[in-house]
Structures are given as structure tokens and as C-alpha cells.
Amino acid sequence: MSAAFYQDEVKFYVAVDCIILGFNNKELNVLLYKRSFESMKGQWSLMGGFVKSGESVNEAASRVLTDCTGIEHLFMEQIGAYGDVSRDLGERVISVAYYSLVNMNDFSPEILESHNATWTKISELPDLIFDHNQMINDTLSVLKKKAASRPIGFNLLPEQFTLPQLQTLYEAIYQTPLDKRNFRKKLNAMDILEKLDIKDKKSSKRGAFLYKFNEKKYNKWVEQGFDFSL
């Protein structure tokens, strides 16, 4: 196809925006930063960047995630493309959004400081630039659907955790209290947890037994799915 075919078409930018979610034992948090450049300088934004020459959209998202977290090969999944004509006040930009689930304890303060970034509770989100609030809302909707058919938690929780911590994570995702008995019945049916001979005594004198995921069984359910609707 000749170059003239492309010359008559409008040129625009392609960007990626990353919804980086973490869990602090109580609530879901998202990583935000204040923009240091125009347009909308000084306002809160998701982590993102433009797709560079010679890289795919997936590679761009992976690069942004590694740069913003200092962690390689993070789980990520595409949410969708956002291309409203007037979404960016600077130029015509189409953005492809990805979400990633991370353990907040893996982040160093230096990484956050270098990007002027901070963890913000989902329940306390400020007004973000462009359509970034919509991207987060769409991510939460996807996460709820995923939680109903796939195990979630491996990327968000520490290696060892209590059952109350795991239930609190699901309650944060579903944004509603869950019945303890029904929740544990579902977990037992999946058989993805290994009980450890260690107790966490931070929350009570008796303490709660710690568990860890059986990675092989966990990945099996990730691949084939499971009815975990609560």
C-alpha cells in the first residue's frame, strides 16, 4: 500500500494508562500521581505514558508498570480503549487501559517518591484527569466479574495471610459484607489453601492461623474457572 494512502489520514497519539491496584488488609487502593506537566498540571492521574516507536501496546504497558513499581513481569490485563475526541485537552490521544494487581508491601518508599506517587483508597478517590475515574470504575466492574469465576488474591495478599484477611479482600472487591460461613465453604470446595502451623496474634490473643495459596491448584482454577459467586 502506497505512502500516499496514509498521508491523507489524521494522525493521533496512542497511550497506555495503568490502574495499579493494591490491598492494605482493609481496602483496595490505587496508585496515583500528580502531573508535573501540561495539560492539567498538578492534578491527579493514573500512571501512564505513550506507546513508543517499535513497541506493542502490551509492551508499553509492561514498561510503564515496571518503571512505576520497580517490579518486572507483573500480572496485567487490558480493560479497553478510551478514545473520546475531546478526552485530552492537549492533543488527540487514544489510551488503552490496563489493570495490575500488586502487593503494596513490595513497594519501596523511594519508588513512590521518585514518581511523586501515592496509594489512594478507592473509597476516597479525587477527581482525576480526563476519563481516568471511568477507567477505575470499569476496572472494578471487571474485577467483580473475575472474582465470581476465578480465585483472586495471589497478587494482592502477602505470601502468608489469615482467612479474615482473605474475606476482607473479597468484601473490598464486592464492596459489600460477606457471610463468613458461606465464604469459607466456597474456599474449602476450591481446596487452594494450605493451613500453616503459625498464628497471627496481632488482632487477638488467641490469634488466627496463617494460610498460603497452593500455587499449582490456584493456577488450575485460574485456567478453568469456578463458580465463586457469593
Predicted region positions:
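Short histidine-centered catalytic/ligand-binding loop motif
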Residues: 46-54, 155-156
